[in-house]
Structures are given as C-alpha cells and as structure tokens.
Amino acid sequence: MKPASLMPAWRACVAQRWRWSGAVPQAALLSALTFGVVLPVCGHRLLYSYFFLRSVFLDAMSEQVLQESLQRGQDALSFWNRASAEPPAFKNLSLKPELLVTVVTTRRSEARDFHYLLQVMRQLSAILPSCGRRRCAEVLVCDVERGPQGNQDASLLEAQFKVIRRSPEEQLQNWELLNTFEREKRDYVFCLRRGWDLLQPRNMVVLEDDALPTPDFFNVIAHLLSRRFSRHTLYVKLYHPERLQRYWNLEPYRLLEWVGLGLVLATALLRVPSWSPRWFSFTLSWAHLLFFTLYFMAAAELLGRHYLLEGRRLSPQLYAVSPATECCTPAMLFPGNSSLRVAEYLDASFCTKGKAKDTVLYQLMRTLPGERAHSVEPNLVTHIGAFSSVRRNPSRPKLL
C-alpha cells in the first residue's frame, strides 16, 4: 500500500520538473531560430541591421542610391528650367510669418550633376501647399558661395525664390585665412541673422542644401510648435544619422526606451492566454518575464531601431521628442527668437576640426544655465548629400 500511496506525489513531482525543463529547451530553440534563422533572413539586406551583409550588398546599394539621386537631380533641373519662365510663386514674402525656412547652399563642384539644392527646393515647393489656403512657410535661399564661378543652381532659383547673399564688400574679406569649419559656422550665422533681419519670423527652420524634407515635414513641425516644450527650447534637431540611432548608446532615454519595449512585449506575450498554444510552457513568472524582456530587446537592437522608428510616421502625434544629441545640423528648428541666441553663441566660439558648429552648439547648450535642446525621431529630412562640401570625398561614396 505504501508504494501505491506515493504514486500521485511522485507523478506530480515529475510533472512539475518536466514543465520547468520544457521551458528551457523551448527558450533555447526559440532563441536559435530567431537569432540564427529568422532575423538573419529578414535583416541581411537592411542597411542599419547588425545582420546586414556589408561585403555583399553595400557597393550595389550605394551605387543604386547615387543613381536615384542623380536622376532626381536631373528631373529637378528640368523642372526649375521650365518654372523659370513662369510667374514667381514663392518670391513675394510676408513679414513676420509663422514659419521661415532658410536653405543654406554653396557650390559643390564634385556633385554638380546631382543638383542637391534643386532637389530640396522642388520637394519644398510640392509640400508648401499642404497646410490649406496659406502656404506652410516662407522660404529663403541663402547662397554663401564665395568663388568666382558662383552657384548656378541658386541663380536658377532666383526666378521663383528670394535668394540672399553677402554684399560685395563682405565677399572681399580674406576668407582663405579661416579653416573650413570656421567658414561653415560663419556662413550659418550669416544665414540665421539675415533671415531674421529680413522677415522677423515667429519660428525658423534652417536646412542645409542636401536635407530633403519628408512629405509630412510641415505637419510635424506644426505639431512640435504646438507643444509646450517648444517654448523653452533653444533648438530642435530634425535629423540624426540613421547609423547612430541604435539602442546601444550612452543616451539614457534610449536605454529606458529599450528596456520599456522589451518589458511591454514580454508582458503582453505572457499575459494574454489566447496567444499561448498548449505546448507553450512559459508563464508570467519573474524568470520567464526576464527571458522574454531580454529576448525582445536583443531582437529589436539586432534588427535595427531605425526600422522600428519608421512606424511612428503614421501620425505627427507619434513622433518622439527627446533630449538633443550632438551630431549633426542638416535640419534645425529654432522656435521663437532662439535663432538670434544661437547666432550669438556661435559667434563667441571658434570652430576647428573636431569642434565643428554642431559640437560647439551642443556643448554650449549643456553648459549654459537655462538652455535646453531636443531631437525629434524619426528624421524629418533625408540626407542626400553623398558628396560633402567641407570634407574630402571618395570617387564613389558609400552609404556606410
């Protein structure tokens, strides 16, 4: 009788141990399939994924992007050549507009066939009417080219847009004595101040001539300006390089976002019974919750945070605002009269290699009491400038 009485207890003990041992091999199998098969198959062509096969696809993808940009540039050139014979649509500017967009441009000899400026201005002309009866913003082109050959693309746009330049006396200054980064900073400050002096806008956006706005550019800008934080910020960055958008970063907010994403997905998976088939051995326990939190965190990082951010484009309300990062300045929003403060701060600093205007501005923002700055994600512009105007360029630039 004694062995028979022990049978139920023995079976219960074995069943309990088997259930736990079933979760361990399931976790191992799930991890092996996810990180060894599914994600490599899904991510081997994604440029910003850890699984991207750089040696196989980078050259071809880089060449494809260059050819697409070249075609857009030629199309934009034809578009503005035709438009030059039409009455000016954007040249009559109103004083104190709600938003001024200033596009800073210079001649790029190595990229002259790509016509970056013409691409950007064509995109702006297409999305400016998206705000209803009144166009979304006033637009200026700030031509900072000092060479004798001039900036032909800016000259072509003069038929449709207001183009501002330095006076002949300012052009004669001995700019060659300055390093490239200091000249770039002074050009930026000139455009900030001249745009303000000319129109006194309530808010200002400064785009570099290789920052192509997204279709929802003005809708998101309007939403950002309607939020309370914009009244107390020095600037809002509208672009951050995609390769630097990963979770594995020193920025605290990204680490919190990363852990939060893993925890929410893990809780949802373990909490909803209808998602769990009969063979699923996991329960809402601390051990299983920790495993799936780390599982989803690893999957999100390896596949690429950039691609998760793209889902936020569904609505302006979904765009994320966070403390500003250091690099870079292709697209900047200056709420209120903060553009004047930025011009003063930059004027007081001297830029050199390793201390360009974006680094100087970020360091000043962090040291000056009462100043703060923000970034918006995902990006509101696409950086199309494969050929730099301030650095040495390879013959065929690569995406990475």
Predicted regions and their residues:
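Short beta-strand-to-loop acidic/aromatic patch adjacent to the donor-nucleotide binding site
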Residues: 200-212
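C-terminal catalytic/acceptor-binding lobe
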Residues: 2-63, 258-262, 267-400
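Active-site-proximal specificity loops/subdomain of glycosyltransferases
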Residues: 142-202
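Short, acidic, metal-binding catalytic loop of nucleotide-sugar glycosyltransferases
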Residues: 82, 90-95, 119-136
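A conserved hydrophobic helix/loop-capping motif in glycosyltransferases and polysaccharide synthases
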Residues: 100-116
